[in-house]
């Protein structure tokens, strides 16, 4: 493993009609045009979504460059396909149900999970951070659990849904939580315990296959990484880079705690669910729950500051401290995706204004 952990980022995007802003089933066309430009896309469960993936990166400058290239290339591919690319975690305006991608596995998922699958159409971002072993990934996952809600608040980008303010900064979180294998991971004492839980979910039918391990943190099935999946897809490249930098430094800090034998916080499922709900509702604009220390409510921005203070040595070690400091100052001035959506909505109550603001931020 490199001197500092490498990272990789995956982002999911929505494809919409350029005129109405409604989701449009063009993923295969967009993937074909993107491939002509040298970018391979992953097709998601619904045919109105695509996913990009960076290569392995050692610096946030590299992550930024790759994300910018991917977003601009896929936006052009979408335009060539008669669609518009949006970095938004739920569609601001939606059909009754989403068409499922024509793929045998996705058809099996739709058959088993019914409207859960057909109402999917949600977009997240996943950050992979290199770790020494799968066992270490699971132990770090246990230590990450208290911080997952505030990371959700940081990236919240799904306030407007079905032509209305949802009342949540991250409505995606509320939709995603309906899946039986989604949400915060349980505390696992070992990789064997993790594997036993996965087997139980498979045997019960709650998962079709191991690709449906949807927990917000998991050891990657394909790479020697821990994958942090809690985020709404951020509105801008800068927001995604900020999230990735904080995640890497948090993992580095928790790896150090693991080496030092520091205690692991035990958090009840109910406390974690309550903290998730509050962060999904308020985002950065309101209250979060401090699960690491007091278990008391505090302003979300203050709790994010507590996390950044905690990981500052790691941020300095990889040269990301100024990036994170400046990124948080920018969020104070401009807001995150959910706040920008609401600002656009409040101007006239017109969904077209939200779509335009999201599209502009996607390529900012």
From Swiss-Prot:
One of its GO terms (molecular function) is glutamate-cysteine ligase activity. Belongs to the glutamate--cysteine ligase type 2 family. YbdK subfamily. It is an enzyme of class 6 (ligase). It catalyses: L-cysteine + L-glutamate + ATP = gamma-L-glutamyl-L-cysteine + ADP + phosphate + H(+). This is Putative glutamate--cysteine ligase 2-2. It comes from Mycobacterium sp. (strain KMS). PANTHER family: GLUTAMATE--CYSTEINE LIGASE 2-RELATED. HAMAP family: Glu_cys_ligase_2. The lineage of its organism: Bacteria, Bacillati, Actinomycetota, Actinomycetes, Mycobacteriales. Keywords: ATP-binding, Ligase, Nucleotide-binding. ATP-dependent carboxylate-amine ligase which exhibits weak glutamate--cysteine ligase activity.
